[in-house]
Amino acid sequence: MLGVVDSFQMHPSNGQDGGNMSKIAISDLKDFCRTVLQKEGMKNEYATNVADVLSETDAFGIHSHGTKNLPGYIQKIRAGGIDIHAEPEIILNAASLATIDARRAIGMVPAVQAMDIACQKANHT
């Protein structure tokens, strides 16, 4: 996805550095996230998009929106709050705007779709 950062450092969960910081390759983190999501039944394309967003968000230091959320997403998937089989639908498509019904898909799926649509529209309007 963003492809700018190769690795990031993860602080211990107690928040105290103490010189003990782990360095994880972004590719390994993406693979882990994708595998977890696929084991829950998410199709490869969507699992890859979600893994890319979560991992690279961590790499840029925005941990509040990164991989720390994966366990919560898994809980919501298992509880039925997130539909891993949902196919977001474009319900309004005009020259310079579009509206997507995410249909309870995990947020990164319609977000990536919306970004692609916005880029296409920007190139044609």
Language model segments and positions:
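Short, surface-exposed connector motifs at secondary-structure boundaries
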Residues: 123-125
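Flexible, glycine/charged-enriched surface loops at secondary-structure junctions
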Residues: 42-49, 64-66
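Short, Lys/Arg-enriched N-terminal segments with co-localized hydrophobic residues
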Residues: 6-20
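Active-site cofactor/substrate anionic-group-binding motifs, chiefly glycine-
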Residues: 66-119
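Generic N-terminal amphipathic, Lys/Arg-enriched alpha-helix
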Residues: 21-40
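N-terminal and secondary-structure boundary signal
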Residues: 38-41, 56-63
